[in-house]
Design a protein with these regions (language model features):
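A short, basic/flexible loop-to-alpha-helix module at the beginning of a structural domain
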Residues: 3-29
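C-terminal helical "tail/cap" subdomain of flavin- and related membrane-associated enzymes
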Residues: 7, 385-515
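N-terminal Rossmann-like FAD-binding beta1-loop-alpha1 element of flavoenzymes
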Residues: 26-57
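N-terminal FAD cofactor-binding segment of flavoenzymes
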Residues: 46, 66-116
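Short beta-strand to alpha-helix junction loop
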Residues: 81-82, 128-147, 219, 225, ...
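Helix-loop-beta segment of a Rossmann-like dinucleotide-binding subdomain
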Residues: 119-138, 175-177, 189, 294-296
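Predominantly flavin-linked oxidoreductase catalytic cores and closely associated redox partners
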Residues: 151-311, 315
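FAD/FMN-dependent oxidoreductases across multiple families
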Residues: 299-383, 387-410
Length: 515
C-alpha cells in the first residue's frame, strides 16, 4: 500500500480564518471527516475551530446546484422538518443559518399553534407556544449548511471517494487517517477533482491512498463500517440495540391550495401501540405539501393515488386525507423501507483506538417519522465541541459517552410506540405503570397548557424526560377531571391508544443543551 503524506502541504499551511477561532484552542494540524452528511458538515464546522485544516470526504458526487438528493440519504425526498432543539442548535453552530433558510423559502412557525399533533386517539390542543420549528426539504437544509461550512476557509470537501478503511499505527492503538479510493476517473468526477487536487489527492487514478489526520470522525451514517474496521484490528465487537417495527413509507407531494389547512403548517398523526398506521403532512419551501404515510409491522402504504387517499382517510384526524383528496398531486410517489431503529453502543466499548470517533446515524438512527435525526446530529455536533474543549486525550471514550447522552431521549421516543406493539416482548411492571401515566398526561394536556408545554419540551429535545415527573405536573395529571382547571377548551377524547416507552423515557439521561 502506498502510504503517502498526501496532505503534507496542507499540514504546513496555516489557514487565515476558521469557525469562531477566538473561542477554541488549537488541537492539531488536520482533522478528517468521513461523510458529507448533515452530521459530517456540522462536525466539520466544529472541528474548524480546533484544527488548521478540516477535510470532508464524501462518497457521493456533490453538485453545486440545489435540487438533487444524495444517494446516501434515501429518505431525503420524504417529509422533513427541524425540531426546536435542532433549529436552535444549528443556529448556534452556524449563526445566520435560520434566516438563510427562511430567505430561501423555509417555513418558520409555532410547533403547537401551527401544527396539529395526534397521538393514538388523543389530539393535542393548539395554542401559540413560542416553540418555533422550521420546515424545509432535506436538500435545501443540507445545501444551505454545506454552503456555510464551505465558506470556512480551512474546510475542504471532496466527493467521489470510497473509504477503504482506517490507517493505524504499528501497534494499532492510534488511528492515523483513512485509506481512500477514487471512484471515478478525473474526466468523470466533475467538480470533485478540484477539491481533491486542493487536498493533495490523486484525481486520475483508482489507486488506494492514505489521508493523514490528527483526528478522524466517522459520519458515514447508518452504513458506517467503523465497527467492522475495529473488529478487523482486534478490538471488541460493538453492542447493537435494534427495534425493528418493519416500517414502510410512501411520500407524495401535493400543490398547496387556498382553503386547505390554511391555519396549519404541519399535521402529524402517530399510531397507538396496537396500531400500525400513521401519517404526516408538512409545508415545504416550493409551495407543496409533502404527505408521508407510514405502515408498520408488515403493513405497506400504497403508492397509487386513490389507494393512497383511502389509506389517509383511515387515519384518526382528517387533515392528511384532506390534502391528498383536495390538492393537486405533483411528481411521482417515493417509497422508503426503514430497516429499524438501531443504536450502536459505542459508549460501552471496553477498548478502542485513539483519535477516532463516530457521530450521527453511525451511532444511532431513528424511525424517521419522528423527525429527530437532524436535530440529534446537531446536538451531537455541539457535544463534540464540549469534548474537544477538554483536548484529545481519551477523546473516543469521552465522545462516545457524550453522544450517547444526546441519543438517549430521541431513541426512547422513537422506539417507544414500537415496543408497545403486541408482537414485542412484554415490558416490566414499572414501565407499564409509567406508560399509563404518560397516557393520562396526554389526555389531561388537552385541557392544560402547562402539561402540553412540558410534553412538547421533551418531544422537541429541550427538556429531559424525567421533567415530566415534576411534582406539580404529577399533581395536574392525577387531579380528577372535574377539579382540573380548564385552561383550554377541548372535546372529551375516547380512551387513548398511545405509544411511548415511558419506563425508559422517564429514566433517560438529561441532555446538556446549553452548556
Amino acid at each position: 500500500m502506498n502510504v503517502s503524506a498526501v496532505l503534507a502541504s496542507g499540514r504546513r499551511r496555516s489557514m487565515s480564518r476558521s469557525a469562531d477561532p477566538g473561542t477554541s484552542r488549537r488541537l492539531g494540524d488536520q482533522a478528517l471527516v468521513l461523510g458529507g452528511s448533515l452530521a459530517g458538515l456540522l462536525s466539520a464546522s466544529v472541528l474548524a475551530r480546533y484544527f488548521d485544516r478540516v477535510v470532508i470526504v464524501e462518497r457521493d458526487q456533490l453538485s453545486s446546484q440545489l435540487g438533487g438528493t444524495r444517494r446516501g440519504v434515501p429518505q431525503g425526498r420524504h417529509s422533513h422538518g427541524l425540531l426546536v432543539s435542532g433549529s436552535q442548535s444549528m443556529e448556534r453552530l452556524l449563526p445566520g443559518l435560520t434566516d438563510g433558510l427562511v430567505a430561501r423559502g423555509a417555513i418558520r412557525g409555532d410547533l403547537i399553534g401551527r401544527a396539529r399533533w395526534c397521538f393514538g386517539d388523543v389530539e393535542q390542543a393548539r395554542f401559540d407556544s413560542g416553540l418555533e420549528g422550521l420546515l424545509a426539504s432535506r436538500p435545501l437544509i443540507e445545501d444551505e449548511i454545506r454552503r456555510r461550512v464551505m465558506d470556512l476557509s480551512n474546510v475542504v470537501l471532496i466527493g467521489g471517494y470510497d473509504i477503504a478503511g482506517l490507517a493505524v499505527s504499528d501497534d494499532r492503538r492510534r488511528v492515523l487517517g483513512a485509506r481512500v479510493v477514487l471512484r471515478k476517473p478525473r474526466e468523470e468526477a466533475g467538480s470533485t477533482s478540484t477539491g481533491a487536487a486542493s487536498a493533495g489527492l490523486p484525481t486520475d487514478s483508482i489507486d488506494e491512498d492514505v489521508m493523514l489526520a490528527d483526528l478522524v470522525v466517522d459520519a458515514t451514517g447508518r452504513g458506517s463500517r467503523a465497527a467492522t474496521w475495529l473488529a478487523e484490528l482486534g478490538y471488541p465487537a460493538v453492542r447493537e440495540d435494534v427495534v425493528d417495527a418493519r416500517m414502510s413509507y410512501v411520500t407524495r407531494r401535493f400543490r398547496q391550495q387556498p382553503g386547505v389547512l390554511d391555519d396549519l403548517d404541519a399535521d402529524v398523526i402517530g399510531s397507538g401501540p396496537g396500531g400500525v398506521r400513521g401519517g404526516v403532512a408538512l409545508r415545504q419551501e416550493d409551495g407543496t405539501w409533502t404527505v408521508s404515510l407510514a405502515g408498520g409491522f408488515g403493513e405497506r402504504p400504497p403508492s397509487e393515488l386513490t389507494q393512497f387517499q383511502a389509506f389517509a382517510r383511515s387515519l384518526p384526524t382528517p387533515g392528511v386525507a384532506e390534502i391528498a383528496l383536495r390538492c393537486e398531486p405533483v411528481g411521482e410517489p417515493q417509497f422508503f423501507h426503514y430497516p429499524g431503529s438501531r443504536w450502536l453502543r459505542w459508549e460501552k466499548l471496553a477498548d478502542r483506538p485513539e483519535r477516532f470517533t463516530v457521530i450521527g446515524d453511525a451511532v444511532c438512527s431513528f424511525n424517521p417519522v419522528y423527525g429527530q435525526g437532524m436535530s440529534s446530529a446537531a446536538l451531537q455536533a455541539e457535544a463534540l465541541a464540549r469534548v474537544l474543549d477538554q483536548g484529545l486525550s481519551n477523546l473516543p471514550a469521552r465522545a462516545a459517552k457524550a453522544f450517547a447522552a444526546v441519543a438517549a431521549t430521541p431513541w426512547t421516543l422513537a422506539t417507544g410506540a414500537d415496543r408497545r406493539h403486541p408482537s414485542q416482548p412484554a415490558k416490566p411492571l414499572v414501565e407499564r405503570v409509567l406508560d399509563g401515566y404518560l397516557d393520562r398526561l396526554l389526555v389531561a394536556a388537552q385541557h392544560d397548557r402547562e402539561l402540553t408545554m412540558a410534553f412538547n419540551r421533551v418531544l422537541n429535545l429541550l427538556a429531559a424526560p424525567p421533567s415530566l415527573l415534576a411534582p406539580r405536573l404529577v399533581a395536574r395529571v392525577l387531579r380528577p377531571a372535574r377539579w382540573r382547571r380548564q385552561t383550554l377548551v377541548a372535546a372529551a377524547s375516547p380512551a387513548p391508544r398511545l405509544g411511548g416507552d415511558v419506563g425508559v423515557l422517564l429514566e433517560a439521561r438529561s441532555i446538556p443543551l446549553d452548556s
